[in-house]
């Protein structure tokens, strides 16, 4: 390893003063994940390739859903459309082959005392839809791959986080992580609403109980934030101060979200839409940035006290809160089994309505993003992940809503049986058939895998001179790293272990 002080400075310079790339290129790169799911779906729906789940099936699952994403940000970073074509071509070929008939599974004898539990069972009011698993799994994999890959020269600088203004893959990734968290946070709200508990208690008691519940989620994340802070300072690890500040890190952002979301959940009694709350927060924040000295403070203030030292993390939190609320609003219509409670519409009609609503919201968020950034017809604002301003919020939400739509369309085409299931057992079997084991594993312990990815990233950076690594060495390290993360995730899933942080 080179001289420690100079090498640390080189590492910091390597991720500093970057301006990002185009939104179009980011869309081409991220579409690889959806196209890989398309190929996986064709293999499974037409050939039942992943049943039984053999070592070969796992290898192909890993190569498609992790390997393709890794290639898209490294060796194929300059030609993502070619990589998409290389995935689409075999998908078309497999689709044209005669489908393989699924051999009926031999049912095991069920003890008499277990038959009542094993029998079909009623469908839950909330479902775990395959496209949500694929969406969240892809987001987690891209995030985990990028946080280590960014330290190597093979990873394009235009994909790394920008200094102040601009768009990049990693800027999108951090916002997507928060959006995804908001998406699943809609589940307890929906269950509370469905069971009639939403208005059972007074506002004050409701808020206090929600705040207490939120602390159960916040405290572990805040502890992780302090551990990361102490580790970075204690090990003299390279850090990009203008990303979040001197002491702040992403775990603090995640940790402070639950109590604020609990407050806004009570405000929802007055404004019954998380999307409206998201826009209210985002627009108010942007107005303050434009009409006061807040923007200058966040970007240029001297770091003289605790707040100014962490000004990026503190004020960007407002933007991330808006993203979380928008994700929660999306979850309110993509998670429920029926968009209208007690609806008598057929499963096909419900499914088509979901696609239409998702498409409409994708159009709304995209239109608002264009309005905020267009110089001729809009406000001409620039995206800034550093401040998490309104254009950044709208970009992240628009991208993720459209990405969700893409995964939902793939689901609809290849796995309609899930939506037609009449009982819980049949639905669970259809869900398992329609989802990748790798994706399910990443979903199940997403935050734990993300934490492990951070630990392994630190380990690699402390033991390997990443700046001088050759392309072959880089790919070797990234493949081993990705395989290790995936192996741990799948092993935890195989042993039915869920780590909740």
From Swiss-Prot:
The keyword Disulfide bond does not apply. Glycans are attached at residues 17, 117, 496. The chain crosses the membrane at residues 23-43, 55-75, 79-99, 130-150, 165-185, 218-238, 244-264, 270-290, 314-334, 363-383, 390-410, 447-467, 472-492. Its main location: endoplasmic reticulum. Pathway: Glycolipid biosynthesis; glycosylphosphatidylinositol-anchor biosynthesis. Probable acetyltransferase, which acetylates the inositol ring of phosphatidylinositol during biosynthesis of GPI-anchor. PANTHER family: PHOSPHATIDYLINOSITOL-GLYCAN BIOSYNTHESIS CLASS W PROTEIN. Belongs to the PIGW family. This is GPI-anchored wall transfer protein 1. It comes from Gibberella zeae (strain ATCC MYA-4620 / CBS 123657 / FGSC 9075 / NRRL 31084 / PH-1).
């Amino acid at each position: 390893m080179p001289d420690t002080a100079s090498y640390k400075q080189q590492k910091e310079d390597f991720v500093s003063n970057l301006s990002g790339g185009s939104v179009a290129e980011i869309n081409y790169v991220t579409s690889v994940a959806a196209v890989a799911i398309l190929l996986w779906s064709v293999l499974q729906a037409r050939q039942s390739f992943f049943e039984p789940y053999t070592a070969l099936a796992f290898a192909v699952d890993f190569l498609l859903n992790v390997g393709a994403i890794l290639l898209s940000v490294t060796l194929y970073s300059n030609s993502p459309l070619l990589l998409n074509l290389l995935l689409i071509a075999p998908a078309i070929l497999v689709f044209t082959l005669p489908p393989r008939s699924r051999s009926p599974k031999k049912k095991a004898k069920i003890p008499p005392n277990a038959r009542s539990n094993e029998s079909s069972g009623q469908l839950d009011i909330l479902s775990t839809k395959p496209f949500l698993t694929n969406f969240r799994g892809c987001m987690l994999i891209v995030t985990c791959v990028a946080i280590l890959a960014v330290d190597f020269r093979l990873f394009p600088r235009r994909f790394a986080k920008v200094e102040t203004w601009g768009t990049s893959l990693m800027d999108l990734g951090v916002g997507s992580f928060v959006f995804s968290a908001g998406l699943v946070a809609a589940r307890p709200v929906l269950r509370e609403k469905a069971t009639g508990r939403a208005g059972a208690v007074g506002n004050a008691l409701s808020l206090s109980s929600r705040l207490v519940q939120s602390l159960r989620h916040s405290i572990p994340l805040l502890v992780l934030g302090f551990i990361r802070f102490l580790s970075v300072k204690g090990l003299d690890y390279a850090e990009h101060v203008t990303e979040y500040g001197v002491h702040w890190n992403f775990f603090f952002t995640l940790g402070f979200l639950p109590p604020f979301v609990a407050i806004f959940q009570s405000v929802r009694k007055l404004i019954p839409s998380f999307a409206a709350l998201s826009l209210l927060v985002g627009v108010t924040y942007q107005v303050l940035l434009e009409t006061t000295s807040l923007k200058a403070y966040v970007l240029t203030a001297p770091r003289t006290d605790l707040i100014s030292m962490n000004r990026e993390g503190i004020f960007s939190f407002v933007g991330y809160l808006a993203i979380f609320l928008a994700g929660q609003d999306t979850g309110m219509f993509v998670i429920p089994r029926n968009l209208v409670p007690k609806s008598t519409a057929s499963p096909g009609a419900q499914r088509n309505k979901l696609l239409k609503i998702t498409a409409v919201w994708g159009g709304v968020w995209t239109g608002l993003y264009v309005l905020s950034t267009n110089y001729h017809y809009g406000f001409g604002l620039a995206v800034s992940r550093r401040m998490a301003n309104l254009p950044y919020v709208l970009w992240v939400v628009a991208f993720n809503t459209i990405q969700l739509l893409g995964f939902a369309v793939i689901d609809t085409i290849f796995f309609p049986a899930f939506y037609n299931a009449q009982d819980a057992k049949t639905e669970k079997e259809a869900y398992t058939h329609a989802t990748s084991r790798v994706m399910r594993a990443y979903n199940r312990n997403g935050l734990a895998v993300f934490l492990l990815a951070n630990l392994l990233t630190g380990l690699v950076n402390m033991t390997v001179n990443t700046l001088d690594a050759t392309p072959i060495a880089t790919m070797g390290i990234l493949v081993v790293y990705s395989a290790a993360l995936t192996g741990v995730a799948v092993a935890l899933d195989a042993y039915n272990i869920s780590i909740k942080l």
